[in-house]
Amino acid sequence: GMGGGSADAGAALIGLNRLWNLNFSTAELERIGLTVGADVPFLVRGGLCRAEGVGEQLTSLTPAPKCWLVLWQPCDGLSTGEIFTAFDTTSAETLARPQTLRAQEALLAGDLPALAASMNNVLEGVSAAKRPQLERALHRLEELGALRAMMTGSGSVVYGLFGSEGAANAALSGLD
């Protein structure tokens, strides 16, 4: 849920490109990265992006308004493959999808609360069914004042999005 091996792969591609003076463009590194993993192109590009397809079709976006995140791993890890297998059997009508266009508008306006309201992770329900602690952790972060609490990737890390450093630090102090 936090990039893991794909982040390592992206960093390795960038590092080797520089070390060996290969002079590959970012687009070329993204194409190579896709052969390693679907989210490697995103981690090669960096910044805030809209990802489509399997994650290889990237559109760079306006940076997010200043915000603070509190990361929390309330339970043991989950198998990404297992989560996606379960997701594939989930009815599309039951999924809370991100509101991508509203998110892009919020980014352009620098509107953090609107950005938070537009965000969703379609894998949350599947992962929470396997690890109920995730749902409790999300509720706890919201109780502690998060503008939005979400799970990263397929889990098991969750995060709270806060509008100030003070609010984030207070929430961190309030975690069990």
Describe the role of every protein-language-model region:
Residues 150-151, 160:
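Conserved SAM-binding loop
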Residues 2-28, 42:
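DPxDG-like acidic metal-binding loop motif
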Residues 45, 49-148, 163-169, 173-175:
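Conserved, helical-rich catalytic subdomain that frames metal- and/or nucleotide-binding sites
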